[in-house]
Amino acid sequence: MYVETQEEEPEIKIPLPRVGITNLRTIAKINWKGRIYTFIPTFEVTIDLPREKKGIHMSRLVESITDAMSEAVEEEVKKIHTSLEELALAVIKRLEEKHKHKRAEVWIRTTLILEKTTPASRKLSYEPYDVEVAVIKEGKDVKKRLKVRVIGNTACPHAMANNNGKTHIQRAIGELEVMADFNEEIALEDMIEVVESSFSSPTYTLLKTPDENAVVRKMYENPKFVEDVAREILMKAREKFPGRIHVRVISNESIHKHDVIAEAWA
């Protein structure tokens, strides 16, 4: 017989709202509306720990991920998991069978690769986007948080207006987070489009010379402050997505040693 030290009483009886595992990497396949996506996600899984328990059974959290992953990898059952948030909920459901808790959270971080077409040569380019999905279940209440991080660029309108049309350009990073009820259908691709379309211009992995020229022209035709980008993302997101919204845009300034930030909530 093994001693279950986790079930013992701790010396300091204070409840902990989040205890679990983090930075666990694995593999998963998602069937999103008939299209198969393969991910190497990083998981963080936590549950609450009552004041009278010394610890949680960590292996049961890993088992819950492994059980859900087996369904998300095997060819014959890959249609079960239709989104990253559905996969996260599947982990929670398995955890409910293995470990008592009142609140559970599953966070999934990964990279979503989307096919894009370059603006002039119309060549195929594979574009990476950092995404984060979380499902939080407390009692019967289930919420989700979806977050995308998109790289674009901006051209400064102030320098352009005061320098005979010449200006500085820089890479910008836009983050959009939506917090909603679990059953709300929100596509990560739509969130990415909202952010990407709000920059002076998108960026591309592949750019032939005509594409490079097209991107530069678009930037100069569409100068924006980081504030403009943040406002546009927020406006579009409020029109398109239910729930609470958080927008954060950082401009990696090309003529300063510091960066610029704009942030908003709705």
From Swiss-Prot:
Class of the enzyme per the UniProt entry, highest EC level: hydrolase
Cofactor info, note text: Binds 1 Fe(2+) ion per subunit.
EC number assigned by the record: 3.5.4.39
GO biological process: tetrahydromethanopterin biosynthetic process
GO molecular function: GTP cyclohydrolase I activity; GTP cyclohydrolase IV activity; iron ion binding
Subunit relationships: Homodimer.
Name the record gives this protein: GTP cyclohydrolase MptA
Organism listed in the record: Pyrococcus abyssi (strain GE5 / Orsay)
Lineage: Archaea, Methanobacteriati, Methanobacteriota, Thermococci, Thermococcales
This protein's encoding gene: mptA
